[in-house]
Amino acid sequence: MNTQDLAKLRSIVPEMRRVRHIHFVGIGGAGMGGIAEVLANEGYQISGSDLAPNPVTQQLSQLGATIYFNHRPENVRDASVVVVSSAISADNPEIVAAHEARIPVIRRAEMLAELMRFRHGIAIAGTHGKTTTTAMVSSIYAEAGLDPTFVNGGLVKAAGVHARLGHSRYLIAEADESDASFLHLQPMVAIVTNIEADHMDTYHGDFENLKQTFINFLHNLPFYGRAVMCVDDPVIRELLPRVGRQITTYGFSDDADVRVEDYRQVGAQGHFRLVRQDKAILQVTLNAPGRHNALNAAAAVAVATEEGIDDRAILRALESFQGTGRRFDFLGEFPLAEVNGKPGSAMLIDDYGHHPTEVDATIKAARAGWPDKNLVMVFQPHRYTRTRDLYDDFANVLTQVDALLMLDVYPAGEAPIPGADSRSLCRTIRGRGKVDPILVPDSTQAAEMLASVLTGNDLVLVQGAGNIGKIARHLAEIKLIPQKTEEERHG
């Protein structure tokens, strides 16, 4: 951003007084890196640390950020403030050094709240669908020429980044309930997509505590703000009377203020009508599959309608929507060597969903778009606690595929829990008699084991939130199946 653009932005959004150097501990995370990217473009000196390089750190380095691939006390020297992700422990040497030097240490959401404080904030919360809905709202506002700032938890494929600094007063951000830090945010508009039991360690295992935290988040809206909520979700419907703010509901339900009707899916596109109160009915073509994405689009349209955005811009943005990284992310269709004596091909889709509801939505979208395909899932459970708490739900959902390969649980720093491991889950699924799962003990064996279950008319879903995305990219690079050596080809 040039000097003239910065001056224009400063007329809208004052800079943080006396803050020049901002250091991020865990800067390679999508949420952390997105905020760092916005601040770098605002002209702040950015540094950060993480354990290994990734596309986020590479992008920040190109913007002039100093990145350390270690955690050392000297990394925070001269920092005005240190921003930490929820994954960073209090005994991290950089955190300890910052406290000793009386450098403020704040959570990611506090910095996001500071970015939002002088802007018209739109926050997207909920157990599922936050990232995609954030991208949809951002796409509509950009298509309407409103040039928003956005901070997303996933890659916005149309922009090629997780976050972008705009020149207007609008800031669109994903709001994270996993550590309850979204309570720092004070938006003008808040979307809540759904509420389910997840991250229950944060809420001391008390679902009522989780529900009340969402209510408290919505009460951070000013009295003239607006909550946009999915009335199809039973928990949200239950909570509506407790929300003391203006509400717009959306969903397939007959009483929704923004109602989805006549949904049908053709391949990767959804087609449906959106019926709005006192507004023209919209005939929507959405370039994203699944009924869950129709709901995400309805939320985005509800916000855009409230803002007075032209319907033509809304429809253009949804029809050209390019999606987000690792959300039903199409990586290619690859020809296969002859399988069962017939030539064939397989589609490869990468998806971040790691909760049973998300996995179920992905499976349903795949079945609706490609009903004749052999549906193969490569799944990596995420966290032992989630696997334990949602064990039966996972077993029920994963029986819907035609073939299942399961990697070991991605621990995300957790210790193993007896009975909440992939071997146990495979055993339970096998006992239900619908699919015979294959345990993949070593991720390097995934491609070889996958080749053994392909039929030549396949849709392969690589599913999970851990490091399984690397496996998806590897499968795309090798075109799904390991290539034979010259010696193997010629016997």
From Swiss-Prot:
InterPro entries: Mur-like_cat_sf (IPR036565), Mur_ligase_C (IPR004101), Mur_ligase_C_dom_sf (IPR036615), Mur_ligase_cen (IPR013221), Mur_ligase_N (IPR000713), MurCDEF_pg_biosynth (IPR050061), UDP-N-AcMur_Ala_ligase_MurC (IPR005758)
Keyword terms, alphabetized: ATP-binding, Cell cycle, Cell division, Cell shape, Cell wall biogenesis/degradation, Cytoplasm, Ligase, Nucleotide-binding, Peptidoglycan synthesis
GO biological process, one term: regulation of cell shape
Pathway in which this enzyme or protein is active: Cell wall biogenesis; peptidoglycan biosynthesis
Enzyme nomenclature, EC number: 6.3.2.8
Coiled-coil regions listed: none
Catalyzed reactions per annotation: UDP-N-acetyl-alpha-D-muramate + L-alanine + ATP = UDP-N-acetyl-alpha-D-muramoyl-L-alanine + ADP + phosphate + H(+)
Annotated Gene Ontology cellular component terms: cytoplasm
Domain of life of the organism encoding this protein: Bacteria
EC supergroup of this enzyme: ligase
The UniProt record lists the keyword Cell division: yes
One of the Pfam families matching this protein, by short name: Mur_ligase_C
Localization of this protein: Cytoplasm
Main location: cytoplasm
Annotated positions binding ATP: 126-132
GO molecular function: ATP binding; UDP-N-acetylmuramate-L-alanine ligase activity
PANTHER family hit by this protein: UDP-N-ACETYLMURAMATE--L-ALANINE LIGASE, UDP-N-ACETYLMURAMATE--L-ALANINE LIGASE-RELATED
Xref: NCBIfam families: murC
Described purpose of this protein according to its UniProt entry: Cell wall formation.
Protein name: UDP-N-acetylmuramate--L-alanine ligase
Source species of the chain: Klebsiella pneumoniae subsp. pneumoniae (strain ATCC 700721 / MGH 78578)
GN (gene name): murC
